[in-house]
Curated annotation (Swiss-Prot):
Domain called HTH lysR-type: residue spans: 6-63
CDD domains the UniProt entry points to: PBP2_NodD
Lineage: Bacteria, Pseudomonadati, Pseudomonadota, Alphaproteobacteria, Hyphomicrobiales
Pfam family, one: LysR_substrate
Annotated protein name in UniProt: Nodulation protein D 1
Gene name for this UniProt entry: nodD1
GO biological process: regulation of DNA-templated transcription
MF annotations from Gene Ontology: DNA binding; DNA-binding transcription factor activity
PANTHER family: HTH-TYPE TRANSCRIPTIONAL REGULATOR LEUO, HTH-TYPE TRANSCRIPTIONAL REGULATOR LEUO-RELATED
Cytoplasm is among the record's keywords: no
Organism: Bradyrhizobium diazoefficiens (strain JCM 10833 / BCRC 13528 / IAM 13628 / NBRC 14792 / USDA 110)
Amino acid sequence: MRFKGLDLNLLVALDAVMTARNLTAAARKINLSQPAMSAAIARLRTYFRDELFTMRGRELVPTPGAEALAGPVREALLHIQLSIISRDALDPAQSSRRFRVILSDFMTIVFFRRIVDRMAQEAPAVRFELLPFSDEPDDLLRRGEVDFLILPELFMSSAHPKATLFDESLVCVGCRANKQLSRQLTFEQYISMGHVTAKFGRALRPNLEEWFLLEHGLRRRIEVVVQGFSLIPPLLLDTSRIGTMPLRLARHFEKRMPLRIIQPPLPLPTFTEALQWPSFHNTDPASIWMRRILLEEASNMASGDQEPPTRRRC
């Protein structure tokens, strides 16, 4: 199909190369031979009068002209997919949709297990790909590479729609055998004790506790930095270290490890976990259905404030 002299199939090839940054991988992605993909790129270069890609080692690096085309082309292809190809009514029991979700280990353990358990009953063929925190989550949404973000609201941009899931607070956690810990933690103890702290993404972004301390000019003794809250508890056992983590996750581990939950001696901020999706998914039946499930389970959890029953070991 042509539009103003451009074969629209070439836009699929352009999008594939922009994503893969490799001619062979891009050709494989859209079921073309490598010579056919090379010919498609040559035709695109002629049409746009731009080199589009240059080689750097084994990677194809887009020119500024290709970068300018990438967003509009990706959005156009996604709109076609959602408006034409995916417009059929959704039957959850028969759906084999795969949802790609960026969320923290905290939300995976405390919240998303509910979703997986529910889908096993209502939509057993639905699949999930749960991804760790990205340094550029908004870009992944914009490119349609993920279906949902489940993150603290302050990490979300205003470029896409979002909905509140629930509020959460931070608590301190230590080994139950730690004789330095009483039911009340003093500020002096908090500052002087060794800490295990979580940071996120490749850039190791600080968590909310770290932001609060930096903002108030406070420093503590950090002994271990881990990627994710769920790695904190094992590093507290049989030590005098403490860690700070979301209350619901602390309760989860308190039932499984000899840990003690203590209120922090300073007013650490609460935060809101939220759900965000690409704006072009607003009318996608599968996205609408999954958003309803996510919001229902968040409401159920907030009202009951209990985690799902522990499964029996296999």
